[in-house]
Amino acid sequence: MNMDFLRQQHVSESLLKDVENFRKQYPLTEDMQVRVPNPPIPFYGKDILEMSIATLLKGENLLLSGGKATGKNILAENLSYIFGRPSYNISFHVNVDSAALVGTDTFIDNEVRLRKGMVTLCAENGGFGVFDEINMAKNDAVSVLHAALDYRGIIDIPGYDRIELHPATRFIGTLNYGYAGTKELNEA
C-alpha cells in the first residue's frame, strides 16, 4: 500500500505535505521499521482521515468510538502507516494491569531488571500506541496512563526511570459503547 489511496480520496495536499515533514522530522531506526504496519485494507473516509491526521499533527491523541466492525482499528493501523510510525497494539481485558502496560520486574543475570511494557516501549520509540477497547480496562491500568496522556507526557516507573515521551508518540484509543464488560471513561 502507498499514499495514493489518500490522494484518490482528495485528502488535503497541505495535510499530506505536513505528514511528509513529520516523517522527515522523526525518522525511524532500521530495527523499528518492522513495527510499522502495512495495512491490508486502506481506510476510506476523507473527512475522518483529515480530522484524524490534523489531530495527530497537532500532537494530540485520538479516541475513536463507534459500533462493532466500523473500522476503528483499520483507521488506527492506517494512521500508523501514514505517519510511518511503529505500532504498539494493546488490547484491554480484565487481566491487563498497570504492570502489563508500563513494565514489571524480572530476574535476569542474577539481578532484578525492568521488563518494559508496550506503553513504555511505544513512548521511548515514538510509536503509535493503539489502546483497543480502552473502556474495558481496569481503573488501575488506566491510571498509570494519565501522566503520559496529559500535558506532562511522562511515564514514571517507581524504582526505575522517569520516561519522557518521544515527541512523535501518539496514542489512539478505540471503544465500543454498550457491550458487556465496558464502562464509561472518566474525563482524565
Language model segments and positions:
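AAA+ P-loop NTPase catalytic core and its hallmark functional loops
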Residues: 1-188
